[in-house]
Amino acid sequence: MYRSGNLVKLKLLFWICFAGLNAFALSPAPYLPPLDIFNWWDKAQHAIGFGTLTVLAVLAYPQVSKYRVAVLLLLQGVAIEVLQYVGGYRYGDWQDAVADAVGVLLGLVLVKLIFKRLLY
């Protein structure tokens, strides 16, 4: 299925993206670029980020159920929103958690449609 070197690279890429997404999501708002464009772009960024994490996680950890990956990433998305809400310097938003869930679902669809040959 995979060469072990490729699997290590995928795992490393997943964890780099995971750390980057969390660092960006939990950064104080003054350090973020202003959101001058449409609000839908914020939701799209959530979906793209979590979709990317889903694809990388499923490819990097083929022994883990896709559904377990999905649940763990959904929990992570909710945890980020809770931390933003209680942190006092960001705003937790349930719509962001929904956008995260949409991204996870899109990631699973991408894996099934595009990466099917790698996994089955």
Where are these regions (language model features)?
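Small-polar-interrupted transmembrane alpha-helices in polytopic inner-membrane proteins
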Residues: W15-A25, V69-Y85, A101
